């Protein structure tokens, strides 16, 4: 029986490799319309090659370069880091900006210089922010030296997104537990070989030009001097998007789960794409990701064909994935809770949210608008990939994401029950429950054959 399972797994993995080797392309013209991006979703992929990570790589995150740790040090962050930055107006220009407390900022050194996108130091005495309006109507902020009168030489500076808590930790609203959950969710996706943004735990962020609540204040400019005192945000996360270029016709880089369901059902997707889609839904089920809304999704190009003069660009490897994984490790709000939000980073809410409603029929709890049952090949593929999530790795991910301090309700319960080390006990609960989720996927019965 074990031999038969091993053969089936190898055949599934071979099919994955063969399908990955085939080039599925889509054209991306300069004046691309929103409806044209469906061609890229139709040939898109949900999966990457699964990485083999050392404990150091896992702890430092995907932007850490083991071959050159010092050079990559600016690119990744840890919970011990206190980062410095200059506010970059961004979310005030978005039509749908979400609810999580966040801002973008340009990366600075502790002594007031800037980092380039590749980590070189850029010393500047004084800067100015210029807001530009693009052809698609979108606005973006650029950085210039103050004495660049005609704005001729934009300064390319490393930048990233910061999410913060409100009120400050530990009395924060649990709606903003994305500071913790997104770190864990993105690391788990990375280990499993699914695309995700690069999210890091950070001790604090000192932001010049920020108010105490820049997201709520809807800041549209930054006229601060580099010598001004920063606002300091404690217990935050820093997020870098994937290095791929978004496919963004008319300013819209999203895709919908309903389109994915249609392509899955009507045969427009290959069998391999259907396997990837179901494997991805299983992976998201581990976290209880249930938000099937297009604005949280992104389509990007991981590989472009060489340009041909006069012809539209061709994407050789379109990737489709959920970009915002913050609403995880909780559950959906109640149907009568019209003005509430989905609990996230809440152990008591997440504990009951199993991957399957019925493991005997392989029926997903969070279907994401797709078929309730998943393919047996997707289950086999996930069983193989889940081998990288052993107990030590799972615990290390939750520790790095600071799950031991996230859920104050959980910690109070553990203290009241007499725990001598409630933070370690909290990690035990998160880890053991996640391992049960893994076992669910391994032991589920009657997944569909095709």
Regions found by a protein language model. Give the residues of each.
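C-terminal catalytic region of ATP-dependent kinase domains
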Residues: 307-450
